[in-house]
């Protein structure tokens, strides 16, 4: 009976491990694929997520007032979904060029985290200030950082 339980535990453990295995393509490769396909613009949102049983990178690119959303298969690098939306010129603001990079904002958040793991980042306007909204997983809880996209200052944790 003990042998059956051990085998069952090994099987369940390996299934759990395979679903959380790292993506075959890197974050940078996914960003490069989206930017190449978009033919310009700036990444304003990025995250690795599970959709329909497979891992995908969700990438949002703003090009002027056009928002392009891509889902990129994390295993193959293929674009599995694409949506494009024209944002109105009313309240929607076009994204300005930030002075600090996406990678620098991610680094700042991770440095101020307690053994956290990167989950998601979004570049947006908040109260008239261009900020990176960075989400970090710390164990079973998520921690959110608002980082000024021009100074790198953490505005809110």
Where are these regions (language model features)?
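Long, terminal "pre-/pro-" and other extracytoplasmic accessory regions
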Residues: 1-157
């Amino acid at each position: 009976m003990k042998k059956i339980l051990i085998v069952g535990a090994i099987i369940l453990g390996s299934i759990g491990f395979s679903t959380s295995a790292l993506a075959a393509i890197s974050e940078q490769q996914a960003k490069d694929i989206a930017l190449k396909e978009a033919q310009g613009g700036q990444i304003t949102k990025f995250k690795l997520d599970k959709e329909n049983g497979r891992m995908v990178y969700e990438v949002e690119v703003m090009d002027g007032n056009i928002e392009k959303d891509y889902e990129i298969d994390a295993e193959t690098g293929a674009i599995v979904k694409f949506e494009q939306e024209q944002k109105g010129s009313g309240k929607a603001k076009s994204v300005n060029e930030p002075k600090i990079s996406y990678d620098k904002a991610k680094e700042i958040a991770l440095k101020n985290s307690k053994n956290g793991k990167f989950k998601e980042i979004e570049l947006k306007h908040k109260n008239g200030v261009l900020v990176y909204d960075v989400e970090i997983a710390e164990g079973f809880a998520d921690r959110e950082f608002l980082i000024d996209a021009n100074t790198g200052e953490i505005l809110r944790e």
